[in-house]
């Protein structure tokens, strides 16, 4: 259809130097007012001009057909959406679009397209409610109210189905946990919890042998993060507890810092969940994982003039002093196409000197895009 062509921003229609611009709020007006607008004939080759002209012709035709309100409503909604996407002044096009939608809601409340219009209003309100803006007055609860109204008044309609999906996304539980990659052993540390639609979380700290790290966290064919969670749930935790989060019923994302008591030296996974069994049920429950080291050791890598050399300085994490006689093991991860997973190979080790310096020559002649080298300080 011609409208679909002109609605496509990627169409190859060339534009004149003084291209037609949708720069007046009158284009958001009623269908009757819109079809009466005199477009500038000098801009006949402009893409936006041709699109508006087609919308004028279509709406003029639909306005004469009193027996097909749905067709008129559908064309009018698409016209409003086109104007919004191509409106010159981006500062007020959102507000003009919202006002136009509210007008369409009243004008077409007695036809099925009214449900689609309601959904567009609910979706707009929900998106605006997510914005961190001091002048923002929209709330997700308003969007839910419009959805409930639509589902009640237009059951089985496309708009009602869209509203049901929007409600599910609004009620969806989000949860994540982040910490520093390395913390000092036996010292309390902070974690950032990001959440939505959650008031209480359950946490546990699981020790992970570094040699089993790749086996536990690798995802093979047909596996998902759920499989990682199952493997971690099979390991006895060193600690479990629960914590209440700051309550909020606004259906928005929030974050808060929590304190976690110190852990012994080692590598760990911390699981956070909305249920004490740490199991996933899409949308209804959530589980998140983060990993960290508890170590007194830190390091600084050095750019080597020789690409085959690994160079670094091993330091005490507390005072920054060099650590002598620290063992550094070097590894290569190479993707095995037959097994469809990365295979880890130890390449040797080296010991830091009095300045904490470590250097190890690693041949890269057999490496590829699907191979990488790394190290572990012990």
Language-model features: locations:
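N-terminal, cleavable Sec-dependent signal peptides of secreted/periplasmic/extracellular proteins
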Residues: 1-378
């Amino acid at each position: 259809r011609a409208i679909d062509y002109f609605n496509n921003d990627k169409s190859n229609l060339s534009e004149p130097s003084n291209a037609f611009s949708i720069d007046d709020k009158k284009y958001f007006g009623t269908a009757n007012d819109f079809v009466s607008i005199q477009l500038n004939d000098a801009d006949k080759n402009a893409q936006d001009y041709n699109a508006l002209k087609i919308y004028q012709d279509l709406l003029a035709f639909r306005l004469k057909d009193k027996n097909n309100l749905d067709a008129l409503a559908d064309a009018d909604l698409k016209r409003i959406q086109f104007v919004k996407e191509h409106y010159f002044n981006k500062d007020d096009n959102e507000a003009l679009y919202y006002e136009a939608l509210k007008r369409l809601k009243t004008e077409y409340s007695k036809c099925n397209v009214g449900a689609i219009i309601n959904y567009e209003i609910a979706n707009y309100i929900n998106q605006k409610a997510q914005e961190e803006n001091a002048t923002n007055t929209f709330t997700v609860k308003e969007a839910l109210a419009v959805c409930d109204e639509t589902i009640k008044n237009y059951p089985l309609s496309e708009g009602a189905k869209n509203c049901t999906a929007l409600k599910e996304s609004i009620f969806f539980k989000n949860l994540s946990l982040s910490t520093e990659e390395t913390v000092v052993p036996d010292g309390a540390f902070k974690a950032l919890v990001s959440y939505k639609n959650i008031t209480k979380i359950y946490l546990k700290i699981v020790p992970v042998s570094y040699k089993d790290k790749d086996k536990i966290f690798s995802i093979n064919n047909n596996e998902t993060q759920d499989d990682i969670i199952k493997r971690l749930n099979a390991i006895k935790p060193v600690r479990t507890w629960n914590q209440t989060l700051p309550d909020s019923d606004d259906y928005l994302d929030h974050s808060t810092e929590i304190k976690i008591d110190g852990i012994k030296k080692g590598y760990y996974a911390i699981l956070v969940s909305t249920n004490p069994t740490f199991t996933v049920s899409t949308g209804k429950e959530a589980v998140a994982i983060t990993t960290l080291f508890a170590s007194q050791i830190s390091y600084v890598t050095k750019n080597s003039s020789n690409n085959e050399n690994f160079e670094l300085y091993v330091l005490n994490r507390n005072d920054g002093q060099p650590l002598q006689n620290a063992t550094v093991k070097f590894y290569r991860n190479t993707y095995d196409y037959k097994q469809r997973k990365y295979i880890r190979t130890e390449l040797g080790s080296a010991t830091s000197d009095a300045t904490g310096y470590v250097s190890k020559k690693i041949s890269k002649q057999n490496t590829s895009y699907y191979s990488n080298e790394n190290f572990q300080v012990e």
